[in-house]
């Protein structure tokens, strides 16, 4: 028979699958040389160890790598050996002999084959603790994974929030820039509107050429200007004024004049500085003299008022005023009556400010013609006109276009002074403000 490599012979016998500690313990107990320190009991179910000190020093080193009795006892306990307590040892009196007895169910004298049934104890508590630890570890790992996933989600959310915050800050910056630009634009618009309002105010833009009244006694003042009057281009070009006679020789010495009556002349474009100078001169002349309306008699009411003013008392003009014949002819031919129709045909000119005198100038020619018609009876009393013309027809039905130019001039010299004098007195009693024209914007 072949020997089992795991078997060890014990006293001529063999045992298989027996731990080395049990084999050494069986040899140690069976050795008769060590019976004084370790031996079987009388029954053969246990063994005794005497004098543990000597046994640890003399016997243990021969079979084991240590000489510690506590380690030997611990190994016995690992294989299921138990300590047997005697009645003598349990008493209060210490026994005279140091004797320790150990026993096991399968460690019997003469039954070596039972050693195979002796197994090393496995700690059940340790296995349970190990299982608990593994469960805890798995739970811990799961919780760690959950925490990691939550942390990743939080990081992603934080990243999104950072991006959104950056976008919001950019939008805020752009909105601030737009707001500042809008504020600048609004400030510019407000400044522009205020400048336009100030420029359109009467104190700034309304400073037009307000010439003095040519038919004034020095006491009346021009009325306030009006805004947004529509006037045609023709009415601006055909402006006329009536100037009172003056006795100043320096201003009228070179002009050829006609004795008697005021001067009616066309007004061209005059700069603002010259208009202001004329206004100041006219105001000074009003303070110095009275107005001369008519030298020769025209009508009873007008004659009485004109005779009280001497001709040489005024310093404005030294010679009688001049009445242009072409002007009188245009009045007689009815140009003033067609002036409204021509205004309607011409494009309208929007004027921000026009003095009140301009409106009176627009209607001055028509008023003159009406005055001429109203004073037809006074003109019939004129002897020079009665000798040359027949007044069977009304004045508005006369055909001045077919009349001889010489007759027209004589008629004008005879009729106009009386009509103009009456017209001037009516303008003083009412609110007639002739003007010297104005410059276009």
Curated annotation (Swiss-Prot):
It comes from the Eukaryota. GO terms for molecular function: DNA-binding transcription factor activity; sequence-specific DNA binding. Residues 130-205 are annotated as: Hydrophobic repeat HR-A/B. InterPro entries: HSF_DNA-bd, Vert_HSTF_C, WH-like_DNA-bd_sf, WH_DNA-bd_sf. Its main location: nucleus. Predominantly expressed in the eye. Keywords: Activator, DNA-binding, Nucleus, Stress response, Transcription, Transcription regulation. GO terms for biological process: lens fiber cell differentiation; lens morphogenesis in camera-type eye; maintenance of lens transparency; regulation of cellular senescence; regulation of lens fiber cell differentiation. SMART domains: HSF. Pfam families: HSF_DNA-bind, Vert_HS_TF. It is found in: Nucleus. One of its GO terms (cellular component) is nucleus. Residues 17-121 bind DNA. Heat-shock transcription factor that specifically binds heat shock promoter elements (HSE). Required for denucleation and organelle rupture and degradation that occur during eye lens terminal differentiation, when fiber cells that compose the lens degrade all membrane-bound organelles in order to provide lens with transparency to allow the passage of light. In this process, may regulate denucleation of lens fiber cells in part by activating dnase1l1l and dnase2b transcription. May be involved in DNA repair through the transcriptional regulation of rad51. Belongs to the HSF family. This is Heat shock factor protein 4. The gene is hsf4.
């Amino acid at each position: 028979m072949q020997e089992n490599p795991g078997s060890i012979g014990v006293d001529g016998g063999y045992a298989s699958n027996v731990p080395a500690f049990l084999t050494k313990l069986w040899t140690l107990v069976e050795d008769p040389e060590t019976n004084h320190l370790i031996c079987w009991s009388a029954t053969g179910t246990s063994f005794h160890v005497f004098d543990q000190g000597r046994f640890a020093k003399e016997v243990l080193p021969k079979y084991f790598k240590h000489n510690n009795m506590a380690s030997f006892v611990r190994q016995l306990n690992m294989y299921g050996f138990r300590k047997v307590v005697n009645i003598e040892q349990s008493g209060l009196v210490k026994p005279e002999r140091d004797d320790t007895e150990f026993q096991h169910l399968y460690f019997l004298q003469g039954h070596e084959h039972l050693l195979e049934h002796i197994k090393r104890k496995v700690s059940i508590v340790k296995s349970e603790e190990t299982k608990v630890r593994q469960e805890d570890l798995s739970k811990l790992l799961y919780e760690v994974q959950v925490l990691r996933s939550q942390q990743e989600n939080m990081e992603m959310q934080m990243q999104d929030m950072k991006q959104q915050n950056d976008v919001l800050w950019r939008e805020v910056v752009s909105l601030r820039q737009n707001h500042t630009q809008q504020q600048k634009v609004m400030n510019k618009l407000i400044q522009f509107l205020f400048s336009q309002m100030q420029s359109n105010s009467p104190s700034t833009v309304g400073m037009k050429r307000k010439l003095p009244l040519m038919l004034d006694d020095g006491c009346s003042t021009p009325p306030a200007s009006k805004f947004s009057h529509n006037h045609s281009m023709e009415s601006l070009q055909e402006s006329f004024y009536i100037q009172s006679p003056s006795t100043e020789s320096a201003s009228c010495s070179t002009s050829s004049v006609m004795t008697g009556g005021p001067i009616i002349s066309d007004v061209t474009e005059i700069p603002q500085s010259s208009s202001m100078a004329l206004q100041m001169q006219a105001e000074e002349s009003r303070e110095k003299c009275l107005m001369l309306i008519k030298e020769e008699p025209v009508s009873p009411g007008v004659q009485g008022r004109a005779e009280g003013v001497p001709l040489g008392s005024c310093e404005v003009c030294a010679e009688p005023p001049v009445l242009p014949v072409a002007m009188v002819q245009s009045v007689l031919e009815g140009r003033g009556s067609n002036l409204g129709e021509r205004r309607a045909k011409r494009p309208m000119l929007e004027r921000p400010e026009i003095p009140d005198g301009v409106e009176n100038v627009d209607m001055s020619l028509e008023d003159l013609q009406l005055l001429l018609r109203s004073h037809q009876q006074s003109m019939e009393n004129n002897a020079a006109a009665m000798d040359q013309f027949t007044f069977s027809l009304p004045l508005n039905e006369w055909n001045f276009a077919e009349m001889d130019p010489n007759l027209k001039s004589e008629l004008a010299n005879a009729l106009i002074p009386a009509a103009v004098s009456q017209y001037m007195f009516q303008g003083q009693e009412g609110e007639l403000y002739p003007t010297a024209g104005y410059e276009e914007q």
